[in-house]
Curated annotation (Swiss-Prot):
Protein role: Dirigent proteins impart stereoselectivity on the phenoxy radical-coupling reaction, yielding optically active lignans from two molecules of coniferyl alcohol in the biosynthesis of lignans, flavonolignans, and alkaloids and thus plays a central role in plant secondary metabolism.
Native organism taxonomy: Eukaryota, Viridiplantae, Streptophyta, Embryophyta, Tracheophyta
Originating organism: Arabidopsis thaliana (Mouse-ear cress)
Keywords linked to the UniProt accession: Apoplast, Disulfide bond, Glycoprotein, Secreted, Signal
Signal peptide bounds: 1-25
Keyword Transmembrane helix set for record: no
Summary of the tissues where the protein is detected: Expressed in root vasculature and meristems, cotyledons, flowers, siliques, and leaf trichomes. Localized in the interfascicular/vascular cambia and developing xylem.
Full protein name: Dirigent protein 13
Disulfides per UniProt: 36-182
Domain of life: Eukaryota
Membership in a protein family: Belongs to the plant dirigent protein family.
Length: 184
């Protein structure tokens, strides 16, 4: 009986090892010089200020905790329009839906989780971006960690550049998204 369990276990491990080496041997290495897809978009954020209910695209659902001068603890949800140019009234190609929160006690820093949801005839699905957003820096690189639809299991880098800030009410971010692992 013990010998039979040993043989079955050995066969199972052999099949498992064979499958894993087969999958790994067909993986294509990333070519960082040439992404398989690239998008340049503009995200437009209009913060809710108590009066602009119809125009707001983001709102704080948890206000700062008062632990410093850098909005520590503030949690913001958003549903922002995305356009191909800097004009917020241009045709929307996608929406960024998700949240970010301020987690820096000694400087302005946010951590975000966003889905770039495409609503065009050219692309269907969403890209998922998450990570540290040191938004006081001129450019920030965040990982594209997956997606749905046309972007299922994709990976890449989203470079954010703050394009315009109008006080605490409006900001625009240029997003340069390069995908290095594409399946569709």
């Amino acid at each position: 009986m013990a010998n039979q369990i040993y043989i079955i276990s050995l066969i199972f491990l052999s099949v498992l090892l064979y499958q894993s080496t087969t999958v790994l041997s067909f993986r294509q290495p990333f070519n960082l010089a040439k992404p398989c897809k690239r998008f340049v978009f503009y995200l437009h954020n209009v913060a809710y200020d108590g009066d602009n209910t119809d125009n707001a695209t983001s709102a704080a659902i948890v206000n700062p905790l008062g632990l410093g001068d850098f909005s520590f603890g503030k949690f913001v949800i958003m549903d922002n329009p995305v356009t191909m140019d800097q004009n917020m009234l241009s045709e929307q190609v996608a929406r960024v839906q998700g949240f970010f929160f301020y987690h820096g006690k000694t400087k302005y820093d946010t951590w975000l989780s966003w889905s770039v949801v495409f609503n065009s005839t050219q692309h269907k699905g969403a890209l998922n971006i998450m990570g540290e957003n040191a938004f006081m820096e001129p450019t920030r690189d965040l990982p594209v960690v997956g997606g749905t639809g046309d972007f299922v299991m994709t990976r890449g880098i989203a470079t954010f550049m703050t394009d315009l800030v109008e006080g605490s009410k409006y900001f625009r971010v240029k997003m340069d998204i390069k995908l290095y692992e594409c399946y569709y």
